[in-house]
């Protein structure tokens, strides 16, 4: 790269360093740049176009219309294609459209929101286009601002140390050359070249946590504590070092354990097992890391809350734990670990009652139709439905008293946004009740509730060691 080009702009220098570090060893012939039309991705596209000849590679672009923003997504794609055509020589541009409704369908399956689903489908498109055009490396335009937003979001979500490593500069075929570049630097780079970019209206929507962090939290931090980024860098560097130490300790521990996480096939997927004595003898933090490893081996697709893994790590070797779709239980001399998907629960329920109506399941909510006594696998573990002289009661192995009475049929389900339950003098929101009881997020998503005739009749808190809340029927119900 020429000396004059180094002086043009700091962004170009950062990208050149990234290319030297990640591209030279791989010796790719083609780079695929993911471009949305926004400032970050356009800056990366221009930088890649300028630097590609110096590294002996060609560059091409891919842009994706997610079919989420009416005509705006199509206009973004058209803008990117026209811009690529103006380069000299013109850059090949692959315009891909995700079919209408596909993102929402994916979000329902993954249970992690529309933005997560859009990202998952977008990366599938990138992989497909990379294979089609022969690109060995895909460049994405994550910036230093994205890094801090991600770290803050994960920090407040109680993420594990592995997630607090932040966005990686490279993973597989994906390289992120702008991770040390600020958004201010990006915009300055484009302005020096007279390049205009498009703004995605969804980036200002406050319903998304990342946007609230970007537009509300970070400006507040800047106003109150100007050097917070430097302090955060040091904190996360320390976390990273401690995480590396724990990984090394786990490796040494595994060398002395000959049967760590053996697969055990079953009808509804695979479980993993290890000797109970080995698991219980491990330090708490090693158990935590073992469970993280097990989640990876089982291909758990949803983000598991840290609290859920910590609860499993406190397994006493006797009582089964079922939280956030994970299950840890004793099986003779072994402990069994499995991921219970909503689809698994639905299939089990279908087997128990082939004639039952469809579940009232909504996005993020599991619901089981109950029309007879028996054992029902739920998000918190197996619940027992018993017929007693006073009526039908729901209980579990840890709580034989249970909650009730009810009458058949009814649903056992998890929390739904807006849930309220009848109390003296009116109704009370379940979310407020969770806050008053100090229920962690990992338990809120699995605490069982009983719904009958469209009315929430009970919150069965005793299933996880909390109070019960039972709503008597009113005369006009």
Curated annotation (Swiss-Prot):
One of its GO terms (molecular function) is ATP binding. Keywords: ATP-binding, Cytoplasm, Ligase, Nucleotide-binding, tRNA processing. Its EC number is 6.3.4.19. One of its GO terms (cellular component) is cytoplasm. GO terms for biological process: tRNA modification. InterPro entries: Lysidine-tRNA-synth_C, Rossmann-like_a/b/a_fold, TilS/TtcA_N, tRNA_Ile_lys_synt, tRNA_Ile_lys_synt_N. CDD domains: TilS_N. It catalyses: cytidine(34) in tRNA(Ile2) + L-lysine + ATP = lysidine(34) in tRNA(Ile2) + AMP + diphosphate + H(+). ATP binds at residues 36-41. It is an enzyme of class 6 (ligase). It is found in: Cytoplasm. Coiled coil: none annotated. The N-terminal region contains the highly conserved SGGXDS motif, predicted to be a P-loop motif involved in ATP binding. Belongs to the tRNA(Ile)-lysidine synthase family. Ligates lysine onto the cytidine present at position 34 of the AUA codon-specific tRNA(Ile) that contains the anticodon CAU, in an ATP-dependent manner. Cytidine is converted to lysidine, thus changing the amino acid specificity of the tRNA from methionine to isoleucine. HAMAP family: tRNA_Ile_lys_synt (MF_01161). This is tRNA(Ile)-lysidine synthase. It comes from Treponema pallidum (strain Nichols). The gene is tilS.
């Amino acid at each position: 790269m020429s000396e004059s080009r180094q002086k043009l702009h700091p962004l170009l220098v950062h990208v050149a360093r990234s290319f030297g570090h990640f591209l030279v060893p791989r010796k790719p012939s083609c780079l695929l740049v993911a471009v949305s039309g926004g400032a970050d991705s356009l800056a990366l596209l221009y930088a890649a176009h300028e630097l590609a000849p110096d590294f002996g590679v060609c560059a091409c672009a891919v842009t994706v219309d997610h079919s989420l923003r009416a005509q705006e997504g199509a206009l973004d794609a058209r803008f990117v294609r026209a811009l690529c055509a103006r380069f000299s020589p013109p850059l090949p541009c692959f315009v891909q459209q995700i079919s209408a409704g596909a993102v929402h369908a994916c979000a329902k399956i993954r249970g992690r929101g529309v933005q997560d689903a859009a990202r998952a489908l977008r990366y599938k498109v990138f992989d497909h286009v990379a294979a089609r055009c022969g690109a060995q490396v895909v460049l994405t335009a994550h910036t230093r601002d994205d890094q801090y937003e991600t770290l803050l979001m994960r920090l407040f979500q109680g993420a594990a140390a592995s997630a607090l490593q932040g966005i990686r500069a490279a993973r597989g075929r994906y390289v992120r050359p702008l991770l040390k570049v600020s958004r201010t630097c990006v915009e300055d780079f484009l302005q020096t070249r007279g390049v205009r970019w498009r703004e995605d209206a969804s980036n200002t929507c406050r319903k998304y946590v990342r946007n609230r962090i970007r537009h509300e939290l970070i400006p507040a931090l800047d106003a109150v504590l100007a050097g917070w980024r430097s302090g955060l860098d040091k904190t996360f560097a320390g976390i990273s070092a401690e995480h590396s130490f724990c990984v090394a300790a786990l490796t040494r521990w595994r060398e002395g354990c000959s049967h760590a996480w053996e697969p055990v096939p079953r009808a509804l997927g695979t479980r993993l097992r290890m000797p109970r004595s080995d698991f219980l003898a491990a330090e708490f933090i090693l158990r935590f890391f073992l469970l993280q490893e097990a989640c990876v081996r089982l291909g758990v697709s949803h983000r598991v809350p840290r609290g859920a893994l910590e609860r499993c790590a406190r397994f006493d070797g006797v009582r089964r734990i079922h939280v956030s779709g994970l299950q840890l239980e004793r099986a003779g001399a072994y402990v069994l670990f499995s991921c219970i998907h909503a689809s698994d629960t639905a299939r089990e329920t279908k087997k128990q009652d082939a004639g039952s109506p469809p579940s009232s399941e909504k996005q993020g909510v599991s619901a089981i139709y109950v029309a007879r006594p028996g054992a029902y696998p739920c998000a918190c573990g197996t619940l027992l439905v018993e017929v007693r002289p006073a009526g039908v009661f729901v209980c579990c192995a840890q709580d034989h008293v249970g909650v009730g009475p009810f009458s058949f049929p009814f649903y056992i389900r998890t929390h739904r946004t807006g849930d309220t339950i009848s109390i003296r003098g009116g109704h009370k929101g379940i979310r407020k009740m969770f806050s008053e009881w100090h229920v962690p997020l990992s338990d809120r998503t699995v605490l069982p509730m009983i719904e009958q005739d469209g009315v929430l009749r009970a919150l069965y808190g005793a299933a996880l060691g909390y109070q019960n809340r039972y709503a008597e029927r009113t005369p006009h119900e």
